[in-house]
């Protein structure tokens, strides 16, 4: 069993600053995110939005938890986003594959990347504290020049959305996901979100990370 020390640290910090888990948009599933997500966010917040890279979670976002097969509807949406943003700008950042803790040889990440043609970021720190590793990867491998040009998509408020807000990026929260699965931490996240969701989210600004 993986103990996410980084996630525990993030939870403690979130208690002091709960706005960090507030997403900029919510959708039930990944396949329901509009392809014109830039326009969607611009209309919602009335600010310019220039998203150049999408950072996807894996478990319950595009696959069932602990599996590697991408659901049909989710794969179709991935290909649509790849056509819009370019293949190298739609990447996977997961705490189950690509991490030094669970995938030390990188074999799982390499297999997933080759099978689905989706770049998988290797990182030593778990989400949400892998900001430097992620931004270094994006700076070297994508068109991103500012954290405000990144959109995070995932089903976890304390990892995916918190990471987005720490970096000064955009975050989309999937409220149901592929398998509509839940666990104790997800229930805690939902409980906390219901009590603070009326607060305004942090709005990304066009700055260097």
UniProtKB/Swiss-Prot annotation:
Catalyzed reaction equations: a 1,2-diacyl-sn-glycero-3-phospho-(1'-sn-glycero-3'-phosphate) + H2O = a 1,2-diacyl-sn-glycero-3-phospho-(1'-sn-glycerol) + phosphate
GO MF, one annotated term: phosphatidylglycerophosphatase activity
Entry keyword set: Hydrolase, Lipid biosynthesis, Lipid metabolism, Membrane, Mitochondrion, Mitochondrion inner membrane, Phospholipid biosynthesis, Phospholipid metabolism
Localisation per UniProt entry: Mitochondrion inner membrane
Pfam family, one: PGP_phosphatase
Motif Phosphoryl acceptor: chain residues: 57-61
Any single GO BP term: cardiolipin biosynthetic process
Membrane topology: Peripheral membrane protein
A GO-annotated cellular component: mitochondrial matrix
Cystine crosslinks: none
Pathway given in the UniProt record: Phospholipid metabolism; phosphatidylglycerol biosynthesis; phosphatidylglycerol from CDP-diacylglycerol: step 2/2
The EC number(s) this enzyme carries: 3.1.3.27
Keyword Mitochondrion found: yes
Main function: Phosphatidylglycerophosphatase involved in the biosynthesis of cardiolipin (CL), a unique dimeric phosphoglycerolipid predominantly present in mitochondrial membranes and which has important functions for cellular energy metabolism, mitochondrial dynamics and the initiation of apoptotic pathways.
Family: Belongs to the GEP4 family.
NCBIfam families: HAD-SF-IIIA
Protein name in UniProt: Probable phosphatidylglycerophosphatase, mitochondrial
Species: Schizosaccharomyces pombe (strain 972 / ATCC 24843) (Fission yeast)
Gene: gep4
């Amino acid at each position: 069993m993986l103990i996410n020390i980084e996630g525990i640290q993030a939870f403690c910090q979130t208690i002091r600053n709960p706005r960090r888990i507030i997403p900029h948009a919510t959708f039930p599933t990944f396949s329901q995110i509009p392809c014109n997500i830039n326009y969607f966010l611009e209309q919602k917040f009335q600010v310019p939005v220039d998203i150049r890279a999408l950072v996807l979670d894996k478990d319950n976002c595009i696959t069932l938890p602990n599996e590697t097969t991408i659901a049909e509807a989710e794969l179709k949406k991935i290909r649509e986003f790849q056509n819009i943003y370019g293949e190298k700008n739609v990447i996977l950042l997961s705490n189950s594959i690509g991490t030094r803790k669970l995938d030390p040889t990188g074999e799982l990440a390499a297999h997933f990347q080759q099978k689905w043609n989706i770049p998988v970021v290797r990182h030593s720190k778990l989400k949400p504290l892998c900001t430097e590793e992620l931004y270094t990867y994006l700076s070297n491998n994508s068109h991103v020049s500012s954290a405000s040009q990144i959109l995070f998509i995932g089903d976890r408020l304390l990892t995916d959305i918190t990471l987005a807000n720490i970096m000064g990026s955009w975050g989309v929260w999937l409220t149901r996901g592929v398998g509509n699965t839940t666990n104790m931490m997800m229930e805690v996240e939902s409980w906390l979100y219901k009590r603070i969701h009326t607060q305004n989210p942090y709005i990304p600004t066009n700055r260097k990370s």
